[in-house]
């Protein structure tokens, strides 16, 4: 992913986290398609998760690696269910938000920095 886009995404997350309820990301594709994405979606409650992600959470086991954890949305839900969770994201602003939201084990890292067998479940939630 483009480092500039990663930074801009993080700025939008921080804007919302710091009180800008109208923060929006504009998704622009190479084919010219554009679509607004309200940043509030990255801060929704577990009751608002899509059914496939609810099912994925129910099927987690043991120590969970939440890849691309963003704002900690799913990490927090897993922690509340008693799981040990390691949340990783390559976006430093997202990592800062997760720390402030009380995700217990947060790392600014890429999945390729981990070796096989360290986790019981690897989640890539959206």
Residue positions per predicted region:
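Conserved SAM/SAH-binding beta-strand->alpha-helix loop
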Residues: 91-92
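Conserved class I S-adenosyl-L-methionine
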Residues: 61-70
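Conserved SAM-binding loop of SAM-dependent methyltransferases across substrates and taxa
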Residues: 71-83
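Conserved SAM-binding loop and adjacent beta-strand
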Residues: 21-53
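A conserved beta-strand element that flanks and buttresses the S-adenosyl-L-methionine
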Residues: 123
């Amino acid at each position: 992913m483009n480092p500039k886009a990663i930074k801009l995404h993080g700025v939008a997350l921080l804007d919302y986290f710091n009180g800008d309820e109208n923060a929006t990301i504009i998704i622009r594709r190479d084919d010219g398609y554009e679509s607004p994405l309200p940043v509030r979606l990255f801060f929704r409650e577990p009751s608002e998760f899509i059914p496939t992600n609810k099912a994925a959470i129910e099927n987690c086991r043991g120590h969970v690696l939440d890849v691309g954890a963003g704002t900690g949305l799913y990490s927090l839900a897993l922690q509340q269910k008693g799981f040990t969770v390691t949340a990783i994201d390559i976006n430093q602003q997202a990592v800062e938000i997760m720390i402030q939201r009380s995700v217990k084990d947060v790392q600014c890292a890429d999945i390729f920095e981990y070796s096989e067998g360290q986790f019981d479940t690897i989640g890539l939630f959206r």
